Amino acid sequence: MPYFHRVDAPRVLSMGLVALDVLCIAQEPERTSFRAGGTAGNVAAILGALGWPATLAGPAEESLAYELMLNDLTRCGVEYREMHRAAVPVIVEELEHYARHSFTFDCPACGKALPRYHRTYRADASSWVCEDVHTDVFFADRLSDEILELAQSARRSNAFIVYEPSDPSDAPWAPAMLALADMVKYSDERADGLSWLSDGDHLEIRTKGAAGLQWRWARHEIHQWQSMASIHVANVVDTCGAGDWLTSGILIGLLERGDTRATWSGVTAMEQVLRRAQQLAAWSCGYAGARGALYESGPAMARAIVQHLETSVMPDPLPESNAGFSCAACPMTS
């Protein structure tokens, strides 16, 4: 079960890359784990498991992939809303020794192509969110006409807007989204492909992998890049999903004070938020899969890290589905 549900916890609506993650571990060939994934899916699931009222919007269809994804989101306390009828994307992570992983979009058993992400949404998306979903935080890692319209609607309701650009094809919508955003986070390795990135008064975070991160926040007169080293992890199992844990930790540190306009100011205060978020991300690297920590240690352990709790916490791992399909694609797309 999720760690807790506080009535005053910020509400988050997440949109963009939503998928079913299939985790195959070389040392455990008999085990296949099925979890909700994609950046938007992971952020919603982490925050939902840690107690935020979380809503995730994405594709839906009658398939085993959809059922497995939906069941996992339910365990994390996430409400799922259908935005359009389409196949749920399926991403296979193959985890090998020494924390090496690779991703494939073909079934490793039969070679069949797996469903991929497509930028297609319902025409009435704006009325759907305005009538049924009230949010304090709007998160997106992919853009479209509909997602931008929903972000604008959220902004009019004074929501905190988060954009994580990673896809160059966001270009037609990116300038408008950057103008709306309160927080923009992206990886150094993808920045060169995002030629439309521009300065703004938002909190800007540039992650650099093992080299740490840089940040600046013009709104609070912090115009120069501030650098922070990474946190050493003694036993790295899998770095997949660490960025999603970092995002979740930052949002918890910034917004659980009850002010979704983020009145944090000053380098020291912001670095404390970022450092605890880095600790959360580093901790997640000790587990297999993007959110493996939730299924092996649990939400209470994550809470203790991000809140820097001194008291000992007992593990409370979430249950998960470990199905023994011999073919990752065919049962999911049939």
PLM features: residue spans?
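Short beta-strand/loop segments at the ligand-binding rim of alpha/beta enzyme cores
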Residues: 154-163
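Structural alpha-helical scaffold elements that stabilize or flank donor/cofactor-binding regions
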Residues: 130-131, 174-177, 197
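Histidine-anchored nucleotide/phosphate-binding helix
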Residues: 39-49
